[in-house]
Amino acid sequence: MNTVRVTFLLVFVVAVSLGQADKDENRMEMKDKTEQGKSYLHFAENLLLQKLEDVEAKLLEKDSEKSINSRQKRCIEEGVPCDENDPRCCSGLVCLKPTLRGIWYKSYYCYKK
């Protein structure tokens, strides 16, 4: 019976000591995994940031292309009625009273400067 007890005690001590070693090893392994996870998250954040910056650059390019190629906003041509307070006559034209009043419906028209 003593040999069984000694054997059982010996197996128990070995199991406990190996279990402790595994526990420390598991802690180190988990630490490594979390560090790898953090580095992966950092990499993913940088990749996403780079993609967003690329999209933003493309959008800004389109906006600048529009402003370069865009024509003048809608404007009123010569001889067309305009508003005295908000003259939207095309460049080179001025919103003035016509020389012959009463013929036209509105009192101001776009004329050359």
From Swiss-Prot:
Q: Which Pfam families match?
A: Toxin_22 (PF08092)
- Please provide, in alphabetical order, the Gene Ontology terms of the cellular component aspect for this entry: extracellular region
Task: Give me the residues of the propeptide, which is removed upon maturation.
Answer: 22-74
Q: List the disulfide bonds.
A: 75-90, 82-95, 89-110
Where in or outside the cell it occurs: the entry states: Secreted
Q: Where is the signal peptide?
A: 1-21
> InterPro entries recorded for this chain?
Toxin_22 (IPR012627)
The molecular function terms in GO held by this entry are:
sodium channel inhibitor activity; toxin activity
Report keywords, A-Z: Disulfide bond, Ion channel impairing toxin, Knottin, Secreted, Signal, Toxin
What does this protein's UniProt record list under function? Answer: Probable ion channel inhibitor.
Task: Indicate the family of this protein.
Answer: Belongs to the neurotoxin 14 (magi-1) family. 01 (HNTX-16) subfamily.
Q: What is this protein called?
A: U11-theraphotoxin-Hhn1d
Organism of provenance = Cyriopagopus hainanus
